[in-house]
Amino acid sequence: MTGVLSGVRVVELTTMITGPLAGMMLADLGASVIKIENPDGGDPFRYFRGGRYGGHFIAYNRNKRSLTLDLRSARGKDCLLYTSDAADE
């Protein structure tokens, strides 16, 4: 996607509404956003109003890639550090 933030890389470790909204705006402006989710069901917002992948979740997480990492494990932490190294500060 092209935009004013094209070439910017963002690693998003947020849930529910406000964090994903910020990531959505960055992605809409062209940033490459990777949403990090836990392996125990991911972002609780996925299940908002009882569904899976409801309209709100899809809207707030559009234009993003998702990566599932278990941040309780050493391997998950290493993967996060590796992913973060490629992100902009």
Regions found by a protein language model. Name each.
Residues M1-S84:
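N-terminal helix-loop segment corresponding to the beta1-alpha1 unit
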